[in-house]
UniProtKB/Swiss-Prot annotation:
Lineage: Bacteria, Pseudomonadati, Spirochaetota, Spirochaetia, Leptospirales
Enzyme class: transferase
Biological-process GO terms, alphabetical: rRNA base methylation
Claim: 4Fe-4S is one of the keywords in the record: yes
Species annotation: Leptospira interrogans serogroup Icterohaemorrhagiae serovar Lai (strain 56601)
Keyword Acetylation in annotation: no
UniProt-recorded name of the protein: Uncharacterized RNA methyltransferase LA_0098
Binding-site residues for S-adenosyl-L-methionine, renumbered to this chain: 248, 276, 297, 344
Signal peptide: none
Length: 415
């Protein structure tokens, strides 16, 4: 694949075909787009494969940057496949239903590699071969939220259109990313609403979570999960998440993700510090790595749940505290006594305070898991120096067919 930096000189004048712009994208770029150029403009295209010639409907502009969707394909790539979803590419949820899943993984690996090289090459940081963890690309989500609205008297229920707050109704067969139980629950709710047996929902969203085969309200009820994981021997772990609490959404990859983290974290740590610890899932899986575990999380409900979760698994030597990592400093004594860090921040990445503390403290190593590879690599570029090496990069495709993916990296001090 060509990198984003290649091919700029091949730009040309804009051509109009049947009232639409005719473009030839040259490379894949982040967020599920391919990129095309004219003499003065840059175009980010959905539903277009590099090398194709496509008629494009423009949806958004910012200066000389344009975003659009390929509506007709004039020259078709051999990599294109028919979409298995009737509302792609209108729906803003998925980005890769016009290529095979294997090709999607190849694209995501290419984008991650390019981002790593862009940020780290000037520091002469050696980048290890990227590993990939993936599972079934269909029916994987254990949590979902659909948008609700009306067009006149007609009920709308689905996902937002690309670059819009217009709702694209779910197909009759439901969303490919959702389990059948969840698709049925959404359809049944709307059917009962039409019949009048359910009050018309005034909320703009409807959210569910899957507990086994049972669908429950995301915001109103806590949920229990269990998994068999090899850490290293096979063990069954259980955990609960409070109503509205965060959880990894791919039900097929939670165990492989935890097993990979277990593999990467060194044994016999005096203390592990976990930031953005959620409801304590990683601590449950990795407690054998250390005699002491300290986790920080902004949500007091999640902290209380984390304390209950470790007890559910017979673990007593873990401590969890409520702390806003965006605005508050971590207690220095506790940090200095932690030989290894684990961080799983939101998409925005590490806060300035966390990053400054990490640089100042210089632990023996850390593991960073993120659903935004650009902020992850940005943070790495600010921390990595001659004393540290990047020893593992693993792409975990938590979000098949969409523009997102998870990345785990391990950083450790050089010998």
């Amino acid at each position: 694949m060509k990198s984003d930096s290649e091919g700029h000189k091949s730009s040309s004048k804009i051509q109009i075909h049947k009232g639409k712009i005719l473009l030839k994208p040259r490379s894949w770029v982040n967020l599920g787009y391919s990129i095309a150029n004219s003499e003065k403009e840059t175009f980010f295209l959905k539903n277009a494969i590099p090398g194709e010639t496509v008629d494009t409907v423009l949806l958004k502009r910012s200066g000389s940057l344009f975003w659009g969707v390929a509506s007709e394909i004039q020259e078709v790539s051999s990599e294109r496949i028919p979409s298995d979803c009737s509302i792609f590419p209108r729906c803003g949820g998925c980005s890769y239903r016009h290529v095979s899943y294997q090709k999607e993984l190849e694209i995501k690996k290419f984008l991650l590699q390019e981002t790593l090289e862009h940020f780290l090459s000037k520091k002469h940081i050696q980048i290890p071969e990227i590993e990939i963890l993936s599972g079934d690309p269909n029916g994987y989500r254990n949590t979902a939220q659909i948008q609700l609205g009306f067009a006149g008297n007609q009920r709308l229920a689905g996902f937002y259109e690309e670059f819009s707050h217009s709702i694209v109704n779910l197909p009759e067969e439901g969303c490919k990313n959702l389990p059948q139980e969840m698709n049925f629950a959404f359809a049944e709710f709307l059917k009962q609403e039409v019949k009048g047996s359910k009050q018309i929902l005034k909320s703009k969203t409807l959210s569910f979570r899957l507990e086994g085969t049972k669908v429950i309200s995301y915001k109103k009820k806590s949920v229990s999960f269990s998994e068999n994981i090899r850490i290293p021997e096979l063990k069954r772990i259980v955990w609960e998440i409070p109503a509205g609490g965060f959880s990894q959404v791919n039900r097929y990859l939670i165990a492989p993700w935890l097993e990979k983290i277990f593999e990467l974290v060194p044994n016999n740590q005096n203390r592990i510090l976990e930031l953005y610890c959620g409801s304590g899932l990683i601590a449950i899986a990795l407690k054998s790595k250390t005699t002491s575990w300290l986790g920080y999380e902004i949500s007091s409900d999640c902290v209380q749940q984390a304390k209950r979760n470790v007890l559910l698994n017979g673990i007593s030597s873990c401590d969890f505290k409520t702390l806003n990592l965006e605005t508050d400093w971590i207690d220095s004594e506790e940090v200095l006594n932690s030989s290894f860090w684990i961080m799983n921040p939101p998409r925005a990445g590490l806060s300035k305070k966390v990053l400054q503390t990490l640089i100042k403290t210089s632990p023996n190593g850390f593991l960073y898991s993120s659903c935004n590879h650009t902020t992850l690599v940005r943070d790495l570029s600010l921390f990595l120096n001659k004393d540290y090496k990047l020893s593992n990069v693993t792409l975990v495709d938590f979000f098949p067919r969409t523009k997102h993916f998870e990345v785990i990296v391990k950083v450790e001090k050089k010998d």
